[in-house]
Structure formats: C-alpha cells, structure tokens
Amino acid sequence: MPNKNNEDWGGYKGYLDINEKLMVAIVKASETYKKNADAIFRNYGLTFSQYNVLRILNNSPQGKNTITNTSRIMLVSGANMTGVAKRLEKDGFIIRRSDINDERITLLEITPKGKQTIKNIAHEKDALIKMFLNGFSEEEKMNALEDIKRIFKNSNAYR
C-alpha cells in the first residue's frame, strides 16, 4: 500500500504484492477488531481469551466442556488454557472439576455469573461486529467466510 497521504514514514513506501497486501489487510482487520473487543470485555473484568472460554462453554451442552476441547477450539496450549481457567474460576465465572469417569480430564462449567456476563456483553459485541461488517450483504459475508476458511486451511498445510 503506497503512502497515499504523503505522510512522513521515514522513507517507507509500503509497496507490497497483492498476496502480501491481502494478508496484511486480514491481520490489520483482525487486530483492530480484537483491540476494540478487548476494550468491551475489559469493562466486564475479562480478557479476550477469558471471554472466548465463556462463549465456548455457554454454547456447549449443559454449559460444560473439557479444558482440552476448549483449548483446541481456541487454538491455545493446554498450559495457557489452565491459567485462563484458573483466573475465571477465581472470579466466579466458571467451575473447574475433574471428570468423575476419568480424573485426568478437567471439565470446565460456566456459572450463572458467567452466563449473565455473556448476556451483558452481547449487545456491545454485536454492535461492534455490525460496525465492522457494515455494507456487506449476507452473501458477501458467506463468501468472505469461505475464503478466509480456505486461507486458514492452507495455513495448516504449511506447518
């Protein structure tokens, strides 16, 4: 992206090929969304990761899921997930317990406080998403989602 505003960027021209422009645009949009969403979640005493754990549990059967499944859905390590879960439990948003059939498995369960917090956040979060997707038709959203899924699938093949 050439510097169209003639701002002084220390000589940086920003010339990228179309492939890199696309990837940079995706990252910028993602980071901008995350920054804005973080501000919303912070008002409720949550980080982005903590909110996502609550969202996953709230949409799991009986509000429960294993710590392993939750970390896989979020694409984070088990160790990181353990820290996030401990903080959520300390603040009363979830309960952590061992599975009665296999004590090696840790179950996470959303509490009424966690469910209420998800409800309280919904309006602000939905308004933010609506702002980001303003002007996109449902078809354009579906096409963009499919395209981004393809990019993500290709990224998994790279590893």
State each model region's role.
Residues M1-G14, E139-R159:
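C-terminal regulatory/oligomerization modules of transcriptional regulators
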Residues N5-D8, K86-L145:
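Charged, amphipathic alpha-helical coiled-coil/dimerization segments
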Residues M1-Y44:
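N-terminal leader segment of winged-helix/HTH proteins
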Residues A25, N52-I56, Q116, N143:
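Pre-recognition alpha-helix immediately N-terminal to the DNA-recognition helix
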Residues K35-S77:
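N-terminal helix-turn-helix DNA-binding core of bacterial DNA-binding proteins
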Residues V27, R55-Q62, A122, K149:
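Short, locally clustered residues in the helix-turn-helix/winged-helix DNA-binding domain
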Residues I67, A85-K86:
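Short, hydrophobic-biased segments on the C-terminal half of alpha helices
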